[in-house]
Amino acid sequence: MKMTGWKKKLCRGHHLWALGCYMLLAVVALRLSLRLKCDVDSLDLESRDFQSQRCRDILYKNLKLPAKRSINCSGITRGDQEAVVQALLDNLEVKKKRLPFTDTYYLNITRDCERFKAQRKFIQFPLSKEELDFPIAYSMVVHEKIENFERLLRAVYAPQNIYCVHVDVKSPETFKEAVKAIISCFPNVFMASKLVPVVYASWSRVQADLNCMEDLLQSSVPWKYLLNTCGTDFPIKTNAEMVLALKMLNGKNSMESEIPSEYKKNRWKYRYEVTDRLYLTSKMKDPPPDNLPMFTGNAYFVASRAFVQHVLENPKSQRLIEWVKDTYSPDEHLWATLQRAPWMPGSVPYHPKYHISDMTAIARLVKWQDHEGDVSMGAPYAPCSGIHQRAICIYGAGDLYWILQNHHLLANKFDPRVDDNVLQCLEEYLRHKAIYGTEL
């Protein structure tokens, strides 16, 4: 009799335990279904649930980037000087500096792609119908600092876009393998089919972009515009904001294109030869082909698909390309000159009224050291709050408010080893704005 009672208690205990487990699983399933409902509904892009605050909150909670430092990013993005000073002081504390992720880290974590994408918080579905219907192409030229590349890719990534990655042939093998491992996790990210050794200020920097252009035109993705990036770039607009800006171009391109100074004219007066670096020769060059006037700009462009097609297929474009191959830093005058060529789609006339400065174009926001100064006295921007490299500002936290006031799509230069706080706050700002459509 005692045994029977014990068995009944045991069975009752098992029953209650099983019921408790069932209820717990039901709650978990309900929460999971709500989460999946928000995600799945957002995929069809017509869901009112996705527009709801609740679903946005769930989405943001799952996609919010983990803060590495306890700094006031909301204050920094709004230009609060106390928050900026605290971030700059925080950045000076060596003990708080985090070592960047290594090639080995990415080789290991990408063995499980789903875990990698979830842990690193990649957005894996379009956030709006407008974005889905307007895919963007990227040519990404990199050679070092694997974490910089992964964070840049994460910041510009959207599944409807297409990304070509060119890795310098001279890069260490472990870096190349880490890049391959990262891009293997995404169906719309690929390595350029032809890789070249990139030498500073030489033709090879242009060739890297041309190789990606060829590959991107072969893609089945109907991209509308091409943006090119390097490893020290970072977006300052969300993908939705980029789509809006590109639509407003209405087929035009956007890149710096100005009359060259006498100093810059010397870049194509004599031929240059390349070994491990660029060497000036005494051989004078012939004038540019087709009596084309030369213009100068920078390496970055926002180019329509039709412009890219004409770069690769138009005989006049090809003649100019051949002519600039032995000049100094051809990326800084090839695109600028093609932007003024009358046969190029989306170009603008030679006339001085159409000169475009780097501040007017939307391609890239850069602080040049020799232009920094007192804005109240006419300087275009205040001094860099980070450090300078080749007379270009590597941004600090004190630059972020100014950066976000500009209309450019991307900015240069960022380096987490110089100031990771500015990148952390920019990442947080962009992710919040992508989900909620509002600033921090």
UniProtKB/Swiss-Prot annotation:
Pathway: Protein modification; protein glycosylation
Keyword Disulfide bond among UniProt keywords: yes
Topological domains annotated Lumenal: 31-440
Spans within the Cytoplasmic topological domain: 1-12
GO cellular component, one term: Golgi membrane
PTM entry text: N-glycosylated.
Cell compartments where the protein resides: Golgi apparatus membrane
InterPro entries: Glyco_trans_14
Record-annotated membrane-spanning stretches: 13-30
Glycosylation positions in this chain: 108
Membrane association type: Single-pass type II membrane protein
BP term (GO), one: protein glycosylation
Keyword Glycoprotein: yes
Enzyme class, spelled out: transferase
Reaction equations catalysed: a 3-O-[beta-D-galactosyl-(1->3)-N-acetyl-alpha-D-galactosaminyl]-L-seryl-[protein] + UDP-N-acetyl-alpha-D-glucosamine = 3-O-{beta-D-galactosyl-(1->3)-[N-acetyl-beta-D-glucosaminyl-(1->6)]-N-acetyl-alpha-D-galactosaminyl}-L-seryl-[protein] + UDP + H(+); a 3-O-[beta-D-galactosyl-(1->3)-N-acetyl-alpha-D-galactosaminyl]-L-threonyl-[protein] + UDP-N-acetyl-alpha-D-glucosamine = a 3-O-{beta-D-galactosyl-(1->3)-[N-acetyl-beta-D-glucosaminyl-(1->6)]-N-acetyl-alpha-D-galactosaminyl}-L-threonyl-[protein] + UDP + H(+); a beta-D-Gal-(1->4)-beta-D-GlcNAc-(1->3)-beta-D-Gal-(1->4)-beta-D-GlcNAc derivative + UDP-N-acetyl-alpha-D-glucosamine = a beta-D-Gal-(1->4)-beta-D-GlcNAc-(1->3)-[beta-D-GlcNAc-(1->6)]-beta-D-Gal-(1->4)-N-acetyl-beta-D-glucosaminyl derivative + UDP + H(+); 3-O-[N-acetyl-beta-D-glucosaminyl-(1->3)-N-acetyl-alpha-D-galactosaminyl]-L-seryl-[protein] + UDP-N-acetyl-alpha-D-glucosamine = 3-O-[N-acetyl-beta-D-glucosaminyl-(1->3)-[N-acetyl-beta-D-glucosaminyl-(1->6)]-N-acetyl-alpha-D-galactosaminyl]-L-seryl-[protein] + UDP + H(+)
Domain of life: Eukaryota
GO MF terms, alphabetically ordered: acetylgalactosaminyl-O-glycosyl-glycoprotein beta-1,6-N-acetylglucosaminyltransferase activity; beta-1,3-galactosyl-O-glycosyl-glycoprotein beta-1,6-N-acetylglucosaminyltransferase activity; N-acetyllactosaminide beta-1,6-N-acetylglucosaminyltransferase activity
EC number of the protein: 2.4.1.102, 2.4.1.148, 2.4.1.150
Family: Belongs to the glycosyltransferase 14 family.
Free-text function comment from the UniProt entry: Glycosyltransferase that can synthesize all known mucin beta 6 N-acetylglucosaminides. Mediates core 2 and core 4 O-glycan branching, 2 important steps in mucin-type biosynthesis. Also has I-branching enzyme activity by converting linear into branched poly-N-acetyllactosaminoglycans, leading to introduce the blood group I antigen during embryonic development.
Protein name, UniProt field: Beta-1,3-galactosyl-O-glycosyl-glycoprotein beta-1,6-N-acetylglucosaminyltransferase 3
